[in-house]
Amino acid sequence: HGRDNEAKQEVARFVESVGLTPIILHEQASGGKTIIEKIEHYADEVGFALVLYTACDHGRGIHETKVHPKQRARQNVVFEHGYLMAKLDRGNVCALVKGEIETPNDISGVVYVALDAAGAWKTEVAKELKASGYSLKEFF
């Protein structure tokens, strides 16, 4: 996740509502671990990950001087997304995208779900969780 605390809390409450326990890294004790060490540690304990792409940075190619910078997720989020796909398998990672965010375009087969205000994302995430073998409580 990036710095959008509202989105992070909304997703965490949904995860709880379907009977699962969310792990939000910055809420866990560091125990002297770096962020990547915390991800390594907790990735060993989970079978599925949700990654939040929120508008926390702006960017464009160095030679794209006539192009306005696009909203992007923080670089660490993109890195952590890739790490989790490698660790858990691509089918066990779902990226939630809030707003018009530039996403990595060279990763094929990645599931991106729009984190929409109406909440349709919840149905999509539930489908992904069920496809990964999770039994969920009804959330409607």
Language model features with spans:
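TIR-domain catalytic/interaction hotspot
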Residues: 27-78, 83-86
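Conserved N-terminal substructure of TIR/SEFIR domains
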Residues: 1-49, 87, 138-140
